[in-house]
Amino acid sequence: MNDFIKLAPIKKIQGTIHLPGSKSISNRALLLAAQATGTTQLTNLLDSDDVRCMLDALRNLGVSYCLSNNRKTCEINGIGGPIQSKNNNQLILSLGNAGTVMRPLIAALSVQTQNIVLTGHPRMKDRPIAHLVDALRQGGARIEYMERNGYPPIRLYGGYYGGEIFIKGSISSQFLSSVLMMTPLAYRDTLIKVDGALVSRPYIDITLSLMKIFGINIQHDNYRVFYCKGNMAYQSPGDYLVEGDASSASYFLAASAIRGGTVRVIGVGRNSKQGDIYFANILESMGAKIAWGDNYIECTRGADLNAVDLDVNNIPDAAMTLAITALFSINGPTILRNIYNWRVKESDRLAAMATELRKIGAEIVEGYDYLQITPPFKIESAYINTYDDHRIAMCFSLVALSDVSIIINNPKCTDKTFPDFFTQLSSISVLQ
């Protein structure tokens, strides 16, 4: 198999995309269902590397489930409480580069007494977890760094009981989400106080919404203080439909705004809890035409696209798609602000995007927490490194909407969240 894909110039985009399930929702729902009382059937589950990591980890921890042949429906038999390893000896779980598995499991496995090592891909060992570990230790958790302080791999001994804890919100919302999902299963109540700015707040809304579906309602004071009752139990909702991935929708909506035609993405709509649906509003402000339904978003190319200057902290994944969309704007630089957390994702996305955008001719200013993109007079064909990062691969595929081809290395990295991305893109593309 080739370790690259060459995308020919695309003349027009037109069609309908059925979105894969949301990665963030899939892995949260799996973890909550595993700890709930009763059996839960999840449908439209994402079939991807990250979700397989969560499923493998849960099986190794003694959770039983039945997965359909297409891996999109999963029936989970909840254990009715916090997860505890059935292995009396040390258990080692390797979690790839899946932050939506590593961070929540650190918290979930900090309640019961056990001896579990969590490790993963080399890049995972560069992704910080100190803010999460510090918060859990305040509540009694015994956690040991095995190599570098502040980073995986780690050893978990359990011991979290509750109390008042402080957690920093400036690096990743996954830290707060992970603690929130664990606290109902602790022995005592937990009062969580957020220290500093809270990034990617819509992901907290996803977490709180899912917890409510599983029977736990968390009160908070403007996202600064969270009041979490302990000694509670999650209750299975029975059936739960995982909505489509709004981050994945961004590529197809942007493609339509650039080279439409009309594209309809099915699986998310006006009532979605995912912050990345706001990307459609940004496209509209840039000149695209947007229509909303309960279960779809539709984009039609309108006027030439305008540049934007935005704080995109609440949509960190879809904001990457904006960086590529900016190449096709007509009136000056686009500036994406408050994106430091790009640096601690699957790659240092800020540095990676700057490097690869320069290859195709864009004038780039890379700041500590911002990116300024001035479109080139003519986009140049290039060989794009993806840094084993699915979102970089999918973003740069949109360069083919110009009049040049683009070569994407390691296209299989999209297996992390969207295994058939290139097939789906091809299905709505008319080549030049």
Curated annotation (Swiss-Prot):
Residues at the active site: D317 (proton acceptor)
Q: In which pathway does it act?
A: Metabolic intermediate biosynthesis; chorismate biosynthesis; chorismate from D-erythrose 4-phosphate and phosphoenolpyruvate: step 6/7
Instruction: Give the species.
Output: Blochmanniella pennsylvanica (strain BPEN)
Per the annotation, which location comes first and is thus the protein's main one? Answer: cytoplasm
Q: Which domain of life is it from?
A: Bacteria
Recorded catalytic activity of this chain's protein: 3-phosphoshikimate + phosphoenolpyruvate = 5-O-(1-carboxyvinyl)-3-phosphoshikimate + phosphate
Q: Which amino acids does the record list as binding phosphoenolpyruvate?
A: K23, G99, R127, Q174, R349, R391, K416
Q: For this UniProt record, give its keywords in alphabetical order, as a comma-separated list.
A: Amino-acid biosynthesis, Aromatic amino acid biosynthesis, Cytoplasm, Transferase
Subcellular location per UniProt equals: Cytoplasm
Q: Which terms does the UniProt entry file under GO BP?
A: amino acid biosynthetic process; aromatic amino acid family biosynthetic process; chorismate biosynthetic process
Recorded protein name is 3-phosphoshikimate 1-carboxyvinyltransferase
Under Gene Ontology molecular function, one entry of this record is: 3-phosphoshikimate 1-carboxyvinyltransferase activity
